[in-house]
Amino acid sequence: MSNITVNIKKLAKRRDIIIAFAAVTFFYCFIEYNLIFPVILGVTTIGGGNFLDSILHTIQLILGLLSNVKYILYGLAAVTVAALVCGFVLSGCFYKINNFLSNRKRIKTEFFKGVQKHFLRISVISFEVILFSILFTIFMLIVTVPAVAITRSFLGGKTELLALTVLFDLITLMVLFFGFMFFRIYMAFWYPAVFNFKDSYFSIGKYAADTYFWKIVVMFLKFDVAFILFEFVLIFLNSVLPVSGALAFLRIFLLMFVNWAVKTLFFIVVTISVFSVFLDFKKKVTK
């Protein structure tokens, strides 16, 4: 972790990398402000403000969409477009980060050099990552149904279900925690393998993740806590700040620009952390 801290401090001298990540993060925050926050607010409204009902209604909505071939085709088209955008953006940004952490000399048009070398591979990997992420999230939502149903019954007055509720909730939380942790770690370490090896990217990334698994779990857990707390604050502000009037400027400033600054720093730290761990693994296996 000390090596990661040193790399983050050194990055302050590379304004080009910070600007590249800031540009990408601004696009993400714009989508988050105009699409993700309204959707989250809408989902909670569907369930009448009840969190458990919102989960069940969301699952029903998703399964309804998946039963329509037209929506599946729309979804695949959207995933393809998103993968191509990620292929362009990530191939350039990650190439710059990988070169920086590998202490390689900075070259002109480094971003576009990364796009030229890795666009196709990163696009294909991004398509798979996005598609697998959607399917995995749907599967995990379905996994929660028994626990949600039993918990609703318990909260509805069936106190005899206390032991069963605690058991199902604990098992479900453990499955969700380790399921998402394994999935995200393996997906994240797929990317640095592309920039450091010639083939077998997923296998190498998985091997790297397995080598430092518990160290990575602790690292990701810290990121999760920071990210979730910050998102909860933003979601709360989104629900209470007016969209018009004198305080509308404060809403835009907090939900867009403060969010943008914090997320830029967050994504840079996460990327450096993942690539630093992977490069430590590379040194270990290539000695």
Model-derived regions: residue spans:
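Selective recognition of hydrophobic, aromatic-rich stretches within alpha-helical transmembrane segments
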Residues: 70-102, 140-148, 159-199, 249-283
